[in-house]
């Protein structure tokens, strides 16, 4: 979920589920099991995206593991600087860079805080680095106007729950 703060710092009171915004128009894109939609960001910027890309990058995942455990396997590979894990996170960063430019066009967002377990550790750093590269190289109209960033490591992991818990009561 994404909440909006206007240019004066006021909470706007409207919410949009960017997780379900399309980021892939390919008819064979991954289908979200909850919404039934294809190509949604939720399938690319979550552990689902990591799990899909891992075997293509040469990382074998035990099918008996839960999605969270599979993510941890890839994160461990990333901490060990394995090239396959870097490929996974670079790919996610590329998609994210293009998606951020798309979100900017639609919502005129300025600061984007990236949260969640996938953004944890070296992988999150590489995703951010790649997303910024894509924005600079391929979407120069966003240069100096759109600022994706990462919080501290603990906040990254708890992600949306921390953000939601810190909202003031209205």
Located regions from the model:
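Short beta-strand scaffold segments in enzyme catalytic cores
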Residues: 1-5
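Acidic, glycine-rich loop-and-beta core segments that form the ion-binding/anion-interacting portion
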Residues: 11-23
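ATP-binding/phosphotransfer module of carbohydrate and carboxylate kinases, centering on a glycine-rich
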Residues: 6-11, 25-170
């Amino acid at each position: 979920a994404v909440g909006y703060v206007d240019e004066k710092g006021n909470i706007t009171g409207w919410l949009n589920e960017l997780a379900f915004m399309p980021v892939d128009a390919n008819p064979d894109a991954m289908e979200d099991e909850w919404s039934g939609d294809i190509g949604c960001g939720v399938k690319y910027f979550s552990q689902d995206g990591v799990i899909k890309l891992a075997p293509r990058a040469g990382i074998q995942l035990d099918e008996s593991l839960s999605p969270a455990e599979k993510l941890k396997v890839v994160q461990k590979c990333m901490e060990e600087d394995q090239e396959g894990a870097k490929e996974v996170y670079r790919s996610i960063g590329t998609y994210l860079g293009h998606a951020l430019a798309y979100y900017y066009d639609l919502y005129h967002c300025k600061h984007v805080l990236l949260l969640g377990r996938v953004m944890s550790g070296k992988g999150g750093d590489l995703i951010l680095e790649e997303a910024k590269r894509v924005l600079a190289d391929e979407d120069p109209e966003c240069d100096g106007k759109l600022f994706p960033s990462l919080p501290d490591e603990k906040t990254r992991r708890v992600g949306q729950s921390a953000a939601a818990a810190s909202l003031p009561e209205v």
